[in-house]
Curated annotation (Swiss-Prot):
SUPFAM superfamilies: Glutathione synthetase ATP-binding domain-like, PreATP-grasp domain. This is Putative acid--amine ligase HI_0929. It holds the Pfam family GSP_synth. The record marks R103 as: Transition state stabilizer. ATP binds at R103, F104, D105, K267, K303, G310, Q343, A378, V379, T380. It comes from Haemophilus influenzae (strain ATCC 51907 / DSM 11121 / KW20 / Rd).
Length: 393
């Protein structure tokens, strides 16, 4: 892996980005730079791509096996689930409710490929990974005979067709919070377009506009149309605290992602996987308390179980018990109440002062592409940039 700079800006870059719905390309970072640039990319070898793909498939399979065992045992210790959340998890698993996608975040230093977390419920940067970076590869000068680990779009089409055939339904609703911003809604718009091309009748609405008809005992949209299939770019742990959450198990709406994904999107997964697969080459040691940390490893990352966008991340020095806020992490009491997990600190490589992480996508059960985000700090947060990639066949 290497960072390559100096690519020319397409003369019509802005129009090309807008053509594919990427109207948030110019989200500003603190230094004034934009979320997207044509001028930078990461280059990989075919062997590196094969390794990332194989690792993603392996870890996804491990996570599914883990979820099955946790639900069978009813072992929800350390997750801080409510009784309703436990019920939703078990009901959705028992009903074999379908799932769509997820994104593994990896650290890679050229030798070690390590899982940081699994964004199994509400991952974003999907439009960027599936469409925008592929458009860049096709249009940028000087990259003939290069390829990209990316058939995300094709897998999404296939999976939406599968969902239609499996469910026997015709209408698909997609939602996010009304004020979620263009990044979230851009991802929802993209998935709506994919679903439409897979044969679904599409309806979009804000999460706040989801209603419940007490006579039909179904969730409905603003037109009182039953919501049978619902993609929601809104965390399950938040949705389960909504007033209508008590009706989820009886309303016959299929939520995507399903409630059992709460087991995988919660960072308790990191410690649980390490206990289940100790010394796995692609996992980092992780524990729930500082008292469990091995003495031979001094530096740890303290992560909130339900944090997002690098929020509320601390560094913890085992040798002296000192804890301090990680540079680049925004801190809020909102995320600190969920509990924490301690994960061994992994030294990300710095390229021109930027720290990249790999986001490897799973659609259904297929690893099918990746995108990279880089930031000025080792914690990837709201200042990050999305960077395209390519490999040399």
């Amino acid at each position: 892996m290497k960072r390559v700079t100096g690519f020319p800006t397409r003369p019509d870059m802005v129009q090309q980005l807008l053509n594919v719905g990427f109207d948030y390309y110019n989200l500003p970072s603190s230094d004034g730079s934009h979320y997207w640039s044509d001028n930078v990319a990461y280059e990989f070898t075919l062997a590196e791509i094969d390794r990332i793909e194989d690792t993603t498939n392996e870890l996804h399979s491990m996570c599914l096996d883990f979820a099955a065992d946790e639900i069978k045992k009813g072992d929800y210790e350390n997750y801080h689930f409510t009784e309703l959340q436990k019920q939703l998890i078990e009901t959705s698993w028992r009903n074999q409710e379908p799932y769509l996608y997820g994104r593994f975040d990896f650290g890679y230093d050229g030798n070690n490929l390590k899982m940081f977390e699994y964004n199994a419920d509400t991952p974003t940067s999907l439009l960027e990974a599936a469409v925008v970076q592929w458009q860049w590869l096709e249009q940028i000068e000087g990259l003939k005979h290069r390829d990209q680990f990316n058939w995300i779009h094709e897998e999404l089409i296939k999976h939406f067709q599968f969902l239609k055939q499996q469910s026997g339904k015709t209408d698909f609703h997609l939602s996010a919070m009304q004020d979620a911003g263009r990044e979230d809604w851009g991802n929802v718009d993209y998935l709506a377009d994919v679903a439409y091309n897979a044969g679904w009748n599409i309806h979009q609405l804000a999460v706040e506009d989801i209603g419940y008809n007490s006579e039909t005992k179904k969730f409905v949209d603003l037109n009182d149309q039953p919501i049978e299939m619902l993609f929601k770019l809104y965390p399950l742990e938040w949705l389960s605290h909504a007033e209508f959450a008590r009706h989820i198990t009886t309303a016959e709406t299929r939520f995507i992602e399903p409630a059992w994904k709460m087991l995988l999107s919660n960072k308790a997964l990191l410690a649980k996987l390490w206990a289940r697969y100790p010394n796995h080459p692609h996992l980092l040691p992780a524990y729930f308390t500082p008292f469990e940390l091995p003495k031979d490893l001094s530096m740890w990352v303290k992560k909130p179980l339900l944090g997002r966008e690098g929020a509320n991340v601390f560094y913890y020095e085992k040798n002296n018990g000192v804890e301090f806020a990680a540079k680049g992490s925004e801190h809020s009491t909102f995320y600190g109440n969920s509990g924490y997990v301690y994960q061994q600190k992994f030294e990300l490589p710095s390229f021109d002062g930027m720290y990249p992480i790999i986001g490897s996508w799973v659609v259904g059960d297929v690893a099918c592409g990746m995108g990279l985000r880089e930031d000025f700090t080792a914690v990837t947060g709201n200042d990050s940039h999305f960077i395209p990639h390519y490999f040399v066949p």
